[in-house]
Amino acid sequence: MSTLHTVNKSPFERSAFISALNHLRPGDTLLMIEDAVVGARKGSAFAGLLENAVKTCSVYILGPDLAARGMGENDMIQGAKLVDYGGFVELVTSHDRTQAWL
């Protein structure tokens, strides 16, 4: 069973980001939204953890939230993919379950 893990809090403020990473299993998907997108910035304290995650899981970042924080695709770690709101819906419907990390 595939799981979509969504994280909306900055990894610099809450532990939900790390909890989600620790619960990822091969084939799962991580979707970073709202303030969580800052964790996907190249060179951030969390970049190495995410780069390891993309080896066995899919990592997506909500593009409008990234743009709202002054970042673009070139600011993201290697292997993460941008998704729009339609893509967000597609991710939810294509997984067996969704786990929201608050």
Question: What are the residue ranges of the model-derived segments?
Answer:
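Short conserved AdoMet
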Residues: R25, V54-K55
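C-terminal structural segments of small proteins and small subunits
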Residues: R69-L102
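Structural motif corresponding to alpha-helix initiation and N-cap regions
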Residues: R14, G43-A47, L82-Y85
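Redox-cofactor binding/interface segments in oxidoreductases and associated redox assembly factors
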Residues: H5-T6, M32, A100-W101
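Short, glycine-rich nucleotide/cofactor-binding loops
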Residues: T3-F17, A36-K42
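Short internal beta-strands
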Residues: T29-E34, C57-D65
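Short, charged/polar "capping" segments at the starts of alpha-helices
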Residues: V38-R41, A67-M71
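Catalytic-core regions built around general acid/base machinery
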Residues: F46-V54
